[in-house]
């Protein structure tokens, strides 16, 4: 069958058919087999994602055919995410290096970045921002790209993830505005305060992790799980964040499917669950003053995990 394939669009169609027939999971950057196959084929050929349709008729040479077919086969047989196969992923319209040192870039927070965090920052002045649990660095670097007057710190406990994040800082040419810091949450940030703290921390429960499709087994578990209910790290963050926020500071955190568990655990805390184009995505916003007002309940919940 593959001998009959010749054009770029042929290989995209073939890849999409193989992915669909194999029942692959599309949770890393794409949600369907056609976009997944398009990403794989174009990246493997070193072509841009917005390639004009006319180029789809272009023919692959023998070496390119072999490379693309090999990647399609690995995507199916090994369940490796496309971003890892081709070494790149897109987030908030920006290209990032991606490999097994950190999770594949993905978060609804990209939509917030692209919209200027409207309406959350409409009446706030931001000079310093923090991306906590940065992984590949995608959130913090994207914040700096979209807001050239911000200074952004990106933090992770994993030296492997930070090495990738530092490569992405250079890749996006934001060395003068983004600093990568290895730290267990706020431990290495003494004396620093931020107008905005954004985080996509690990929040997958142990039961959820055990049931995840094979694609997720290629990602570092440290970046996915956080205790039995997925909230261990989030609670520590809530307990400590006020000390690192400016007086009018804002905290935005993604907790995904752990949203209900968090709301149930801290019912008196006025989490504002942000609505995205596709609806709620388990991302909350919380003012520093609310963290202070409910500090006792938050600390009790956090200390119960220690």
Residue ranges and their predicted role:
Residues 5, 34, 61-65, 103-106, ...:
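Short, solvent-exposed loop/helix junctions and linker helices
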Residues 54-56, 60-62, 66-148, 157-164:
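SAM-dependent Rossmann-like transferase core, predominantly class I methyltransferases
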Residues 112-115, 146-306:
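S-adenosylmethionine
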Residues 46-47, 102-103, 203:
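Active-site/binding-pocket entry motifs
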Residues 22-27, 116-124, 245:
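Alpha-helix termini
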Residues 12, 37-38, 68, 136, ...:
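A general structural signal for well-ordered alpha-helical segments in protein cores
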Residues 2-92:
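N-terminal auxiliary segments of SAM/dcSAM-dependent transferases
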